[in-house]
Amino acid sequence: MTLRALSTIPSVNRSIVRCTRCPRLRAYCRRVARDKKREFRDWEYWGKPVPGFGDPDARLLVVGLAPAAHGANRTGRMFTGDSSGSWLYEALYRHGFASQPQSLSRDDGLTLNDCYIAAAARCAPPGNKPSRLELDRCRPYLAAELRLLRRVRVVVTLGRVAHENWLKAAGWWERLSPGARPVFAHGTMTQLPDGMIVIASYHPSRQNTNTGKLTRTMWHAVFERVAAVLEHHG
């Protein structure tokens, strides 16, 4: 069955978990799951592609880069078990999109309201850098989610790779001339011809948060803007 034939988010998620399109990434995820990190040696790592997570009727879509090797690749849930997730879920909770401010494991009771989380790549990549070919192979899953998440009005892209891959999955990369495409710069908000609003943000990775490139004030301003836009649109 093709991805286009899938008619529900759960069916897309099952297809993601079974994916074997990228041998390098599958081998890496399995190796990480086998060798583990010392502090997580008692965990049974997920070690498979990570599906999307959240409310299928969401108006907010958050698009990240890829699972972290000892984060979502360990826990099996997007942005769960690492510092990036701590930043994301704390902000989602503060603005009413999450039931709790922490995300530690996929059975911790966390639920999302009016928010769905996806990613450009679904397998943890070595060095946090999926190849262009791997992103191309994975993009149909994001496109399938976009087709089924019919109520989304605002998209937050976390990092340039997520930003550009969302534009490609949504079809805007081809439809818009290079000069008309929404540029990636932290805090920029663009309304597309169909009314969709995309807000770009630096990714809440340690590389950005520990260096001050992304501060808490900058981060929360993104979600304050999201909340304001959704309130305005009803």
Model-derived features with residue positions:
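Polybasic, lysine-enriched low-complexity intrinsically disordered terminal tails
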Residues: 1-3
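A polyanion-binding, active-site-adjacent surface
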Residues: 6-233
